[in-house]
């Protein structure tokens, strides 16, 4: 099925370039297996940490024009509980485990704890609504980013991808720090913001945390630009994420320089079937335009 869509990232073979993004249907093995069976080329888990984190109380998401604002707070049951779920993921599923922490040591320990079950580790140094010392507060600092990537690189043997925030002055600088520290790939981008929506009846923010990260179609132009800029400055593969809902969005990311695209918010609108929809459209586009492989499309906007 979709043989012309086959590709690879860091020697991980993918049957197609669509990947479940972190944070959406990624906390249980049953959901991860379902997404893969439904057509995704790989899956990324929800971000998890060494210790359990309850996150923020409801409401944690609110729909806005062009997307969704969320402030879940990186809730997760901790690495020990998560290991039990990862054991149940089907062996044929290319699995990317997303981890976060408040220090390089925490990142390294969390990554090492799940390495045996993962084909790749994704480092969440980019969440815009994380607690102090986590998320974007790391990914906005090139030195901290370097230290986190270096620590994880020393702790695991599987490839690592660093997920970067768009909420910086120069994402190319941060990408360079991650690559220099040993990151094998990059994931661009995490949610934009933080943003806020106010209930005009109560004059209060709708989210319990008041603000959160913006995802969905509205952030796609920012994400595509980030991929485009970073592609020109690094020699490692990029996974593009941010507003992908159809094959046209996927094509834009590929042309900008991504080797694969991650899909998250679109599942809320179109369900898990969105992966198959994107693949069908992408294959038809490639046949119509004379492309024989995904690799031929990567970075074409730079030629």
Swiss-Prot record:
Keyword vocabulary terms for this entry: Cytoplasm, Flavoprotein, FMN, NAD, Oxidoreductase, Pyrimidine biosynthesis
Cofactor: FMN
Function field: Catalyzes the conversion of dihydroorotate to orotate with NAD(+) as electron acceptor.
Pathway participation: Pyrimidine metabolism; UMP biosynthesis via de novo pathway; orotate from (S)-dihydroorotate (NAD(+) route): step 1/1
Co-factor remark: Binds 1 FMN per subunit.
Listed EC numbers: 1.3.1.14
Binding positions for FMN per the UniProt entry: 46-47, 124, 163, 189, 216, 242-243, 264-265
Positions with a binding annotation for substrate: 46, 70-74, 124, 190-191
Quaternary data: Heterotetramer of 2 PyrK and 2 PyrD type B subunits.
Stored PROSITE patterns: DHODEHASE_1 (PS00911), DHODEHASE_2 (PS00912)
Broadest EC class assigned to this enzyme: oxidoreductase
Reaction catalyzed: (S)-dihydroorotate + NAD(+) = orotate + NADH + H(+)
One Pfam family cited in the UniProt record for this chain: DHO_dh
Any one annotated GO CC term: cytoplasm
Descriptive protein name: Dihydroorotate dehydrogenase B (NAD(+)), catalytic subunit
Homology family: Belongs to the dihydroorotate dehydrogenase family. Type 1 subfamily.
Primary location recorded for the protein, binned into one broad class: cytoplasm
Gene: pyrD
Active site: 127
One Gene Ontology biological process: 'de novo' UMP biosynthetic process
PANTHER family listed in its UniProt record: DIHYDROOROTATE DEHYDROGENASE (FUMARATE), DIHYDROOROTATE DEHYDROGENASE (QUINONE), MITOCHONDRIAL-RELATED
Subcellular location(s) per record: Cytoplasm
GO molecular function: dihydroorotate dehydrogenase (NAD+) activity
């Amino acid at each position: 099925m979709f043989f012309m869509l086959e590709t690879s990232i860091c020697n991980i073979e993918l049957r197609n370039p669509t990947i479940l993004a972190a944070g959406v249907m990624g906390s249980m093995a049953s959901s991860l297996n379902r997404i893969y069976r439904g057509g995704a080329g790989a899956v990324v888990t929800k971000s998890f940490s060494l210790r359990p984190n309850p996150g923020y109380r409801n409401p944690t998401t609110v729909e806005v024009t062009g997307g969704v604002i969320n402030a879940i707070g990186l809730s997760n049951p901790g690495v020990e509980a998560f290991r039990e779920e990862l054991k149940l993921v089907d062996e044929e599923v290319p699995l990317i485990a997303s981890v976060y922490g408040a220090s390089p040591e925490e990142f390294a320990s969390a990554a090492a704890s799940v390495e045996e079950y993962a084909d790749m580790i994704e480092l969440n140094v980019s969440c815009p609504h994380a607690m102090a010392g986590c998320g974007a507060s790391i990914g906005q600092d090139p030195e901290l980013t370097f230290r986190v990537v270096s620590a994880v690189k020393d702790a695991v043997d599987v490839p690592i991808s660093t997920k970067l925030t768009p909420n910086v002055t120069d994402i190319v600088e941060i990408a360079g720090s991650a690559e220099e520290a040993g990151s094998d790939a990059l994931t661009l981008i995490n949610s934009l913001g933080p943003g806020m929506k106010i209930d005009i009846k109560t004059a209060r923010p709708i989210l319990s945390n008041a603000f959160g990260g913006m995802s969905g179609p509205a952030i796609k132009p920012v994400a595509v630009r980030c991929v485009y800029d970073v592609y020109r400055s690094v020699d490692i593969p990029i996974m593009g994420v941010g507003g992908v809902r159809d094959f046209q969005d996927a094509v834009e990311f590929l042309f900008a320089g991504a080797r694969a695209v991650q899909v998250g918010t679109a599942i809320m609108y179109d369900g898990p079937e969105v992966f198959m929809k994107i693949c069908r459209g992408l294959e038809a586009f490639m046949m119509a335009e004379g492309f024989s492989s995904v690799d031929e499309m990567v970075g074409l906007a730079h030629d």
